[in-house]
């Protein structure tokens, strides 16, 4: 009887549609990468134990988002590059890569990336095989990140769960960014963030999801929103403490990019000004 029950439960779980996303609303310590990594590992293990297939941490989580002048007024470029930034193939990122493989999950992390003599505000997505599935560097800022080089590409990654794109924090306030990802085929957009959150942000994130027909995960140290392609919040954080927010995303053929087919791109050439 017990064996039958276990088999039944397994069959139901296996048949459940979509994929389970875990948004980690975690507040890191400035400059304390070892402590932040230990906390990430602890929460990622909890999320994976509860069935998460995709785990997302906030913007700049690894180093504590010290690259923003509002957070670190006395920051210098030399200190930022030397003490905050990490190479994607360095020891700490290799450890996180191994964690994704060990837990058999997709794991997204925000960090200051050292690359080609510059520093980028980057979100990297590691696959369940421990490989780099995607890497996106923040392309829009409010001039409060003077030592970060702006990214210039919006990659869309094909996975077994669908096509995924990434924006970082202020990128989300520029509507063209999410639209470009949708036009490139993204059905889910991950938005690791740090700055503003609250009622107006909740509305904006729902609009971004609805107007582009995409699932959207907003992951902030004090706020998480998981929104489906109809603009409905399917899960959200409670309070502002460290926590995990779970939500199941599906790719609906009916809702995916629902509004895009009515566009008339030939009328919008003025948008490139």
Predicted ranges, named:
Residues 1-7:
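Sec-dependent signal peptide recognition
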Residues 7-15:
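Hydrophobic h-region of N-terminal signal peptides that target proteins for export
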Residues 22-24, 56, 108, 134, ...:
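Hydrophobic/aromatic beta-strand patches that form the interior of the parallel beta-sheet core
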Residues 27-30, 61-64, 114-116, 142-143, ...:
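Solvent-exposed loop/turn segments at secondary-structure junctions
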Residues 85-106, 163, 172-248:
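CN hydrolase (nitrilase-like) catalytic-core segments centered on the catalytic cysteine
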